[in-house]
Amino acid sequence: MSSAPRSPTPRPRRMKKDESFLGKLGGTLARKRRAREVSDLQEEGKNAINSPMSPALVDVHPEDTQLEENEERTMIDPTSKEDPKFKELVKVLLDWINDVLVEERIIVKQLEEDLYDGQVLQKLLEKLAGCKLNVAEVTQSEIGQKQKLQTVLEAVHDLLRPRGWALRWSVDSIHGKNLVAILHLLVSLAMHFRAPIRLPEHVTVQVVVVRKREGLLHSSHISEELTTTTEMMMGRFERDAFDTLFDHAPDKLSVVKKSLITFVNKHLNKLNLEVTELETQFADGVYLVLLMGLLEDYFVPLHHFYLTPESFDQKVHNVSFAFELMLDGGLKKPKARPEDVVNLDLKSTLRVLYNLFTKYKNVE
């Protein structure tokens, strides 16, 4: 026997019941929200009193918030990563590493992801310094990777410390994929080994420093200078008589310039060429190539260099070719970089010409 069907609950009644429930729920949520806002306001006030100089915490990646008490982590502010100069610096360094390691069939795509374990840094240093490091070839464990990094960085420090470089990286920062530390290391290596690259000057980034104190995350911003001028970066590990002339004896510098102009014109006049401005007229490399041919008494085939260079790369090619001719002539490797000469750096140009003067001053 089937039971009689229950009559449906009247619609208006259910609406009143729902509205009553939602009203109570809304009131409860509102009270909780007000209580939470008061609590947050009190906490904000307490933090403002305890750390008045601490800015509000910026958005950070979830993995960057997994910190122990009093632990600190740094990261580049996202806006700095979009800066054209920063992007150029990263690209130039990536291209340089891949050029150096082309025979190793190593391709680096992302600095922090490909360099943190020490494997690529080991190969890079061995190639640049012409040495062999006593480390395991492949290490998967964190301990093994840090041991390799320790060996590689100690070798780097032995090279850079006598030059006066400030070492702004560590095993933990490199292994922790700290891009700022990795960039500092690569810039130092590039300058020390005179990499044939042109680093963008005055690259500065905003770094977010996150610290955990009393269970709360606190952040602050600092400016980190990655590059200055090429001259200043080179000067960190190389000072010579020309530095002294530029800094302390401008009157003697004028005499040196006149002597070098007299020297180069003595030979370039044979081709009906004359120099009046050292920094500008040697910047494209043409006069340097022709001068080497005159000093060594040979004709330089025109297809070996650009007689009327137009681009920066063509000018760098010419100066680099002139440097090769100097090495073939028994001269030491020039202290200047081809890029510096092309960029109208007078001190670099004077170094190159003075190197020629000391050997060929008695050549007629």
Swiss-Prot record:
A GO cellular-component term linked to this record: actin cytoskeleton
Q: Which keywords label this protein?
A: Actin-binding, Cell adhesion, Cell junction, Cell membrane, Cell projection, Cytoplasm, Cytoskeleton, Membrane, Phosphoprotein, Repeat
Q: Which residues form a coiled coil?
A: none
Where Phosphoserine occurs, the residues are 7, 54
| Function recorded in the entry | Adapter protein that plays a role in integrin signaling via ILK and in activation of the GTPases CDC42 and RAC1 by guanine exchange factors, such as ARHGEF6. Is involved in the reorganization of the actin cytoskeleton and formation of lamellipodia. Plays a role in cell adhesion, cell spreading, establishment or maintenance of cell polarity, and cell migration.
Q: Give the species this sequence originates from.
A: Homo sapiens
Q: What GO MF annotations does this protein's record show?
A: actin binding
Protein's recorded name: Beta-parvin
Q: Which GO terms describe its biological process?
A: actin cytoskeleton organization; cell projection assembly; establishment or maintenance of cell polarity regulating cell shape; lamellipodium assembly; substrate adhesion-dependent cell spreading
Q: Tell me the name of the encoding gene.
A: PARVB
Which intervals carry biased composition (Basic and acidic residues)?
Answer: 36-46
Please list where the region (Disordered) is annotated: 1-57
Q: Where in the cell is it found?
A: Cell junction, Focal adhesion; Cell membrane; Cytoplasm, Cytoskeleton; Cell projection, Lamellipodium
Tissue-level expression: Expressed predominantly in heart and skeletal muscle.
Describe its partners and assembly state. Answer: Interacts with DYSF. Interacts with ILK, ARHGEF6, PXN (via LD motifs), ACTN2 and actin.
